Amino acid sequence: MFYGSSKLLNENEILGLIGELLFLQKFAVKRYGTTKALNGWSGPEPTHKDFSYEDDWFEIKTINSFKNSVFISSIEQLDSENVGKLVIYRMEKMSPSFNGVSLNNLVNGILQSFELDSDKDIFIEKLKQVGYVYNEVYDNYVYNFISVDNY
């Protein structure tokens, strides 16, 4: 794994990054291919959409299972001339011993799935931009995937 900054992501940032990574792994890579999927991931960059590909865009929100609403920080997140999708992942926080989704395991699984070193480099750089570097503390944040909805 890679190491770096000592600043840790907070729980909301962890949950948000997990949602973006699930979307990358389960949808974007399968639809667009690895390199294009990674290049379209703009979540760590100062843009209004988390993923954008030609005429498609996707804004990813991840919420705890007990919440009934999402926070949209600006109208630009959903405003566009092109029709896009708001994708909402609903996750339930579990104990660290639960066999669920943790940030470190998700990152490692995605990284290991890439064949090209250049794709691995892009992925690692984007993770660094969002503030993620491997830390065992992230293993304490384990989630059960409940559902994903598209709007």
PLM regions: where:
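Nucleic-acid endonuclease domains
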Residues: 1-46, 63-151
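Conserved catalytic cores of phosphodiester-cleaving nucleases, focusing on short active-site segments
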Residues: 27, 51-64
